[in-house]
Amino acid sequence: MHFEAEESKEVATDVFNSKNLAVQAQKKILGKMASKSIATTLIDDTSSEVLDELYRVTKEYTQNKKEAEKIIKNLIKTVIKLAILYRNNQFNQDELALMEKFKKKVHQLAMTVVSFHQVDFTFDRNVLSKLLNECREMLHQIIQRHLTTKSHGRVNNVFDHFSDCDFLAALYNPFGNYKPHLQKLCDGINKMLDEENI
């Protein structure tokens, strides 16, 4: 009996994969430390400014600091985990193809966000909400094999908030309280587009 236990340990060692272990460790560590302050060291300055502005507008809209922190923390964790999976070549060909589609969809979303702000009377909350939900579905498919149900819940938490038509209508209201936030968000997104980071 004791011999069988040792033998099974050897078998387990044969399938040991340090690369997978490293990716798991990175995901676990970053999952624990992916707060807004830590993420600023892992995310460039422009992205950090956009995240900060998303936090401010979310906090003001929800009137709930804790909820705003949770949404932005979930966004940061998702972005970081996605980057780790991508950089460590964890995606298969189908997932890589989907990742390319996802990048294009996010780029389209960014262009639409800015365009709706810059061109008067073009804003359509249903268009933005649809784009956000298309991004959500692609993201779920990309991470399906790799991340936990909890991570999928984080994705939903983020997209449930940002794709909410009432939130989008408030954000884009030309006479509303969020106009300065939208201006800063669009400035940051424009910069990210110029730097080809989105």
Curated annotation (Swiss-Prot):
Residues 49-83 form a coiled coil. Pfam families: DUF758. Keywords: Apoptosis, Coiled coil, Cytoplasm. It comes from the Eukaryota. The keyword Coiled coil applies. GO terms for molecular function: cysteine-type endopeptidase inhibitor activity involved in apoptotic process. Gene3D superfamilies: Tumor necrosis factor alpha-induced protein 8-like. GO terms for biological process: apoptotic process; regulation of apoptotic process. The keyword Lipoprotein does not apply. PANTHER family: TUMOR NECROSIS FACTOR ALPHA-INDUCED PROTEIN 8, TUMOR NECROSIS FACTOR INDUCED PROTEIN. Belongs to the TNFAIP8 family. This is Tumor necrosis factor alpha-induced protein 8. The gene is TNFAIP8.
